[in-house]
């Protein structure tokens, strides 16, 4: 009987915990911290030279893989590159095909100058995987910004690495699983600029009666 009462008590506690609503996370000035992070985030294209340390990148990735995803399939794989030699070699290949980019005085590498790059691949056998990867990417970007780390989401480098034979060799070295295709890249780094907000078209959102 005592064991039964104990079990009931545990079940009640678990039930209460599972129904506990999310608590509002506020900054010191009383603002909602999550909303502040979303509304102040900007794409960064100028970075300080040092790579993001791996402990911090692990936190960013932990946030990423906790994104909502269809039937918890987690149909993504990520490779993080912070080796400047690899980034430089890929950039050299990119400049062979895009020599005009070298004329830009702000150009440092093909990942919008970021010193750390996350390569995200999706499971092509699962129809919802591109959406899931997008949700993961947003979690990564926002968590990074909340820690003072800038980012830029990129599709061009992914296309280049799949289409250029020499760059594709680097992609193969990343060892993505069968049926996984490089979908996008995210550059991360400590910002060396403070971009201004760009206008957003609120008229694209309509409430239906």
What are these regions (language model features)?
Residues 1-8:
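Bacterial N-terminal signal peptides that target proteins for export
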Residues 6, 14, 18-209:
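Acidic, surface-exposed loops and disordered segments
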